[in-house]
């Protein structure tokens, strides 16, 4: 499995095409590549998979990455949303690219979807898009992934949606989602249960609570 750490769409490319901490930076997707299919268009595709034995999380909370081995502890994309996808006659979802945070060799992480210069995508309720500035990210409270760079860069103003498969954490009166600002420290009004990373390094940092 790759042990590289994503840097907001940039990865270091090691021998054999894997991620490593050394080597020149490469950009993914490559310049000029066609846009990835929308989330709604990808719903009928085979759901992502992650390893059963090497996953450090409970089966119900197993998150998937592109580096994962064959297995089946992940749910179809359609089950990640609390509401059914809109009908095909409605406005299509904005183009998107799917990235992966590979923060530790022994763990599998959820894909991170970047939207740039597009309207806010449909979000799982009870989130309200009007409350989400374009420099905030949405995180499940059971997983802290804080994307951060010094100094801040205009490309950091992305809406990052971490797709969370651990739907068992949703119950009445509780929202599993946490909003964290991508530049600087998280706002002080986060709930105590969020326990955000207070001083992230100038790279993607992931910690399990």
Curated annotation (Swiss-Prot):
Keywords recorded for this protein, A-Z: Cell membrane, Lipoprotein, Membrane, Methylation, Prenylation
Propeptide: 207-209
Topological relation to the membrane, as annotated: Lipid-anchor
Membrane-crossing residue ranges in chain numbering: none
Residue numbers bearing the Cysteine methyl ester modification: 206
First-listed, main subcellular location of the protein, grouped into a coarse class: membrane
Database matches in InterPro entries: CAAX_1
Tissues expressed in: Ubiquitous.
Keyword Signal: no
Region (Disordered): 182-209
KW Signal (keyword) present: no
Lipid-linked residues (S-farnesyl cysteine): 206
Record-level GO cellular component terms: plasma membrane
Localization (cell): Cell membrane
Protein name stated in the entry: CAAX box protein 1
């Amino acid at each position: 499995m790759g042990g590289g750490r994503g840097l907001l769409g940039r990865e270091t490319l090691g021998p054999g095409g894997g991620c490593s901490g050394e080597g020149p930076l490469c950009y993914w997707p490559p310049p000029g590549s066609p846009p990835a299919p929308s989330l709604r268009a990808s719903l009928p595709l085979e759901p992502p998979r992650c390893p059963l034995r090497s996953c450090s999380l409970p089966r119900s909370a197993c998150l998937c990455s592109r580096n994962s081995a064959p297995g089946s502890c992940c749910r179809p994309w359609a089950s990640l949303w609390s509401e059914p996808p809109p009908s095909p006659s409605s406005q299509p979802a904005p183009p998107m690219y799917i990235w992966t945070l590979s923060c530790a060799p022994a763990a599998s992480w959820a894909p991170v979807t970047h939207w740039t210069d597009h309207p806010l995508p449909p979000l799982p309720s009870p989130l309200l898009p009007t409350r989400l500035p374009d420099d905030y990210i949405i995180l499940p409270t059971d997983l802290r992934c804080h994307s951060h760079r010094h100094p801040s860069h205009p490309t950091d103003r992305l809406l990052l949606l971490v797709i969370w498969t651990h739907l068992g954490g949703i119950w009445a009166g509780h929202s599993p989602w946490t909003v964290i600002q991508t530049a600087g420290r998280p706002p002080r009004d986060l709930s105590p249960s969020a326990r955000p990373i207070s001083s992230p390094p100038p790279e993607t940092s992931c910690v399990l609570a």
